[in-house]
Amino acid sequence: MKGFMIAAPASGSGKTTVTLGLLRALKRRGEVLAPVKAGPDYIDPAYHRAASGVDCFNLDPWAMRPELISALSSRMTESGARVLVAEGMMGLFDGAIDGKGSSADLARLLDLPVVLVVDCARQSHSIAALVWGFSQFRKDVLIEGVILNRVGSPRHEAMLRGALAPLGVPVLGALPRDPALSLPERHLGLVQADEHAGLESFLEQAADVMEAHIDMDALQTIWLRPKRYDAMANVARLKPLGNRIAVARDDAFAFAYMHLFEGWRRRGAEISFFSPLADEAPKADADAIYLPGGYPELHAQRLAGASRFRTAIGDAAARGVTVYGECGGYMVLGKTLEDAAGVHHPMLGLLPLETSFARRKLHLGYRLLEPLGGLPWDMPLKAHEFHYASIVREEKADRLFRVRDASGENLGEAGLRVGSVSGSFMHVIDFSGEAA
C-alpha cells in the first residue's frame, strides 16, 4: 500500500495535530485511509480513528517482528485502504536504548516517505542545518517533504523557505501559530479522545487549516511514488487468551492493541466487549476475561460500586475462567486502589496486591518477558510498561513474568497469578520467538 509518515525532530513539534488534520482532510476528499501509530502509544490511535473513521493499528518496530508489521499492512490493503498515514513517535530517530525501534525503522521497513514537521517558533535560518542533518543521517530513510509549524508571520515564513531552498527538500506548507490547535493533556499523555467534548469541531478546524496551508497535491505526489516492499499476509500470531474472550472497554479500560484482537480473531477466537463503568458483566459463556489498561485511578469509586461487574468477575474466577489484567486492569484485580486524593477504594480482591496513584513514580520502557506460567504464552514476549501507580503492598504469590529491559538488564520478576487469575503492569505486544 502507498502512504507516508508524519514525523518530527522531537516530541511536541505538532505532528499529532498535523496528522489528525491531514487524516480528516483526506477523508473529506474521499480517500480510503489506513491510519497507523508508530510505537506502543494507546491514546493517539483513538484520535486517529475519530479523524479518519477507521481503526488505527500500532506498528512497533522494536516490539513487533518485521513479518507481523508487514502482515498488518497487508491486512489494511485487504480491507480496501488505499493510503497508509503513519504518525511517528518522539523524534524520527528515537527508539529504545540502542536506537532500534524508531519511527525511522518503521519508515524503512514499510518503505514510507517521511514528511518532517518542524517547530519553527524559535528559529529561522537554523532550520536548514536541522533539516539537512535529518535528511543525511540515514540514507535508507527518505525525507521527501517538510511542513513548517508555528510560523509567526509571512516574513518569518519567507526566511524559513529561503533557508531551506538550497537543500532541495520540498516545503509542503507553513502552518501559523494557533493556540486553538492544541489538545488537552494529563499524566499519561493526551486526554482520551472519547473525553474530548469538542473533538469533532477541533478535527474539522484542523482539516481546514491543512487544506488552507499545505499543498495537498504535492503531498499526494509523495505518497504515490513507487513502492519497493512486498507485504506478507500470513504470519504467526499470539495465541488468544481463550475461545470466547470478553474484553472490558470504556474510559477506565481503553488501552488495548487492535492488532491483538485482529490476530486472535484470525486464530478463531470470538471477542465481545463489556463496560465495568456501566456495571456490565462479561458474557456468561466467556472462557477468558481481559481487563486492559486505562485510567481506573480516575474512576475508582465507580468501579468499587459496580456490584454486578464485581460479582460476575469473582464468579468467573471461581469457575476457573481465565481472568487476565494489564496495567490498570492489574490494579483492578488487586485488593485496593488509592486514588490521587489518598482515598482507598476496594477492588476485585482476586490478586494479593494494593496499589496507589497518590504515591506516584514513573515506570516507562520496553520490556522483554519470560512467562512463568498461567497464560497460554510459553515463548519470550515483547512488551511495554508505562504507569505512575505504585505497588504499596504485595503478598506472596506465584509470579507471572521474568523481566528484562530493552538493554537486557535483569529487572527481576513481575506480576502475580492465583489460580486462573493473573496480571502485571506489562502491556504485551508480540512474541519474539519462532513459534506461537
From Swiss-Prot:
Answer whether the UniProt record assigns the keyword Ligase to this protein.
yes
Pathway involvement?
A: Cofactor biosynthesis; adenosylcobalamin biosynthesis; cob(II)yrinate a,c-diamide from precorrin-2 (aerobic route): step 9/10
Instruction: List the active-site residues.
Output: 327
Gene Ontology biological-process annotations: cobalamin biosynthetic process
Domain GATase cobBQ-type as annotated: residue spans: 244-435
Q: Which InterPro entries does the record match to this protein?
A: CbiA/CobB_synth, Class_I_gatase-like, CobQ/CobB/MinD/ParA_Nub-bd_dom, GATase_3, P-loop_NTPase
In Gene Ontology terms, what is one molecular function of this protein?
ATP binding
Q: Which UniProt keywords apply?
A: ATP-binding, Cobalamin biosynthesis, Glutamine amidotransferase, Ligase, Magnesium, Nucleotide-binding
Task: Cite the position(s) of the site with description Increases nucleophilicity of active site Cys.
Answer: 427
Give the Enzyme Commission number. 6.3.5.9
Tell me where the transmembrane regions lie. none
Q: Report the SUPFAM superfamilies cross-referenced here.
A: Class I glutamine amidotransferase-like, P-loop containing nucleoside triphosphate hydrolases
Q: Which PROSITE patterns match?
A: GATASE_COBBQ
Names of the cofactor(s) = Mg(2+)
Q: Which domain of life is it from?
A: Bacteria
Reaction(s) the record says it catalyses = hydrogenobyrinate + 2 L-glutamine + 2 ATP + 2 H2O = hydrogenobyrinate a,c-diamide + 2 L-glutamate + 2 ADP + 2 phosphate + 2 H(+)
Q: Name one Pfam family in it.
A: GATase_3
Indicate the family of this protein: Belongs to the CobB/CbiA family.
Domain free text: Comprises of two domains. The C-terminal domain contains the binding site for glutamine and catalyzes the hydrolysis of this substrate to glutamate and ammonia. The N-terminal domain is anticipated to bind ATP and hydrogenobyrinate and catalyzes the ultimate synthesis of the diamide product. The ammonia produced via the glutaminase domain is probably translocated to the adjacent domain via a molecular tunnel, where it reacts with an activated intermediate.
The UniProt entry, under PANTHER family, shows:
COBYRINATE A,C-DIAMIDE SYNTHASE
Function recorded in the entry:
Catalyzes the ATP-dependent amidation of the two carboxylate groups at positions a and c of hydrogenobyrinate, using either L-glutamine or ammonia as the nitrogen source.
Query: Miscellaneous notes for this chain?
Result: The a and c carboxylates of hydrogenobyrinate are activated for nucleophilic attack via formation of a phosphorylated intermediate by ATP. CobB catalyzes first the amidation of the c-carboxylate, and then that of the a-carboxylate.
What's this protein's name?
A: Hydrogenobyrinate a,c-diamide synthase
User: Which organism is this protein's natural source?
Assistant: Brucella abortus biovar 1 (strain 9-941)
